Structure formats: structure tokens, C-alpha cells
């Protein structure tokens, strides 16, 4: 998960995915410490000037095939941060996005649906 400049509301909801209620691991979803071990990047917030290059490097470090899920209104439209001096733009203005999950913040169930929709795009093994 990459916080590109969010208020952390989406991160709180992402944390709920590992709770017994949503149990994202039952779908084979595991949060990893390195993009080199990831199939998918969750990105939150508008992309700030300080996070533009780190986001690009994280995307480049993720092996192919790679997926990106932009979580929250700010990731999609910059939300309340639109026009801010420190904001570069939405996530899709910096890296390709496969699925957008709208909401401010979106509920864990919506985030889980977005992740599963993105994973459906991966070739079957």
C-alpha cells in the first residue's frame, strides 16, 4: 500500500481488511513489505510532489503482471486537495490504474471488491 498524500482515512479502512469480519487472507490477499513481492499496489490519496518519484519507483519495482487499485476519492479526483500547491494530481496521472474504488473513505467491503476485480484481470495460472 502506498500513501501518496492522503489524510489517512483510507488507510484506516484498509486496515479493516485484515480483521475477522473481512478476512482478506481467505482470498489469498497478503500485505507485503516490498513491492518486489507484490502483484498489486493499493494507492491512496492525491499524489503529492514529495511522493511522485517514490510512487513511480514503487510501481517500477513491482514485477509484471502488476495491478494498481486507486483507493478513495482523492486517489481518483484529488478530492479536497485538488488545486493544492503540493499536489501533482490523481494517481492515474502518474501511473496506470486498473481499478478505482470511490468513497471518502470507502468501506473495507468496497476496497475488497476493488482488489478482487483487479485480481480477475490477472492471467489464470
What are the residue ranges of the model-derived segments?
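Iron-sulfur-associated redox domains of electron-transfer enzymes in respiratory
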Residues: 1-125
Amino acid at each position: 500500500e502506498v500513501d501518496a498524500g492522503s489524510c489517512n482515512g483510507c488507510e484506516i479502512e484498509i486496515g479493516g481488511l485484515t480483521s475477522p469480519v473481512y478476512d482478506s487472507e481467505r482470498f489469498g490477499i497478503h500485505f507485503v513489505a516490498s513491492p518486489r513481492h507484490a502483484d498489486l499496489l493499493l494507492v491512496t490519496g492525491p499524489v503529492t510532489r514529495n511522493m511522485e518519484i517514490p510512487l513511480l519507483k514503487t510501481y517500477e519495482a513491482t514485477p509484471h503482471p502488476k495491478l494498481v487499485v486507486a483507493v478513495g476519492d482523492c486517489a481518483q479526483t484529488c478530492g479536497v486537495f485538488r488545486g493544492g500547491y503540493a499536489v501533482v494530481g490523481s494517481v492515474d496521472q502518474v501511473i496506470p490504474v486498473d481499478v478505482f474504488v470511490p468513497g471518502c473513505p470507502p468501506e473495507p467491503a468496497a476496497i475488497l471488491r476493488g482488489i478482487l476485480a483487479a485480481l480477475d484481470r490477472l492471467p489464470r495460472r
